[in-house]
UniProtKB/Swiss-Prot annotation:
The gene is luxS. It comes from Listeria welshimeri serovar 6b (strain ATCC 35897 / DSM 20650 / CCUG 15529 / CIP 8149 / NCTC 11857 / SLCC 5334 / V8). This is S-ribosylhomocysteine lyase. Pfam families: LuxS. Binds 1 Fe cation per subunit. InterPro entries: LuxS_sf, Metalloenz_LuxS/M16, S-ribosylhomocysteinase. Its cofactor is Fe cation. Keywords: Autoinducer synthesis, Iron, Lyase, Metal-binding, Quorum sensing. Belongs to the LuxS family. Involved in the synthesis of autoinducer 2 (AI-2) which is secreted by bacteria and is used to communicate both the cell density and the metabolic potential of the environment. The regulation of gene expression in response to changes in cell density is called quorum sensing. Catalyzes the transformation of S-ribosylhomocysteine (RHC) to homocysteine (HC) and 4,5-dihydroxy-2,3-pentadione (DPD). Homodimer.
């Protein structure tokens, strides 16, 4: 990695981070002054472990639906292609600690869920690939290490 790349995460040394963590990955200001804050919510250690797709997929559905019960500032929750985490974006919400609280409350809701929202062929592009139990296990594991979320490099 010698030259700066256009994608922020490609400039992050993935061998130096220690999951789990939540870091501000970038900000963008729109033409009318709105600010987007994108967080890297890393569940698994890069290049060492990953989330199984059915569990990740269900966790995406659950977080996308349930987080909106706690904030109107959420723009999107997007899974990473490497299956190690999610990008979570907020608009006009620059309070990192509150973002962590929204995540924690949402993941606590995941633990109480009895079904995966929109887990059907009408509302989902791969409805056969879901696991409520897997999503809940991921949420429980991440919540159990909440004291590590701010420590991106394990120092």
């Amino acid at each position: 990695m010698t030259e700066k790349m256009n994608v922020e995460s490609f400039n992050l040394d993935h061998t130096k981070v220690k999951a789990p963590f939540v870091r501000l990955a970038g900000t963008k200001v729109g033409l009318h002054g709105d600010e987007i804050y994108k967080y890297d919510v890393r569940f698994k250690q890069p290049n060492k472990e990953h989330m199984d797709m059915p569990a990740l997929h269900s966790l995406e559905h659950l977080m996308a639906e349930l987080a909106r019960n706690h904030t109107d500032k959420l723009v999107d929750i997007s899974p990473m292609g490497c299956q190690t985490g999610f990008y979570v974006s907020f608009i006009n919400h620059n309070d990192y600690d509150d973002a962590l609280e929204i995540l924690a409350t949402t993941l606590t809701d995941v633990l109480a869920a009895t079904e995966v929202p929109a887990c059907n062929e009408v509302q989902c592009g791969w409805a056969a690939s879901h696991s409520l139990e897997g999503a809940q296990a991921l949420a429980a594991e991440f919540l159990a290490k909440r004291d590590e979320w701010k420590n991106v490099f394990g120092e």
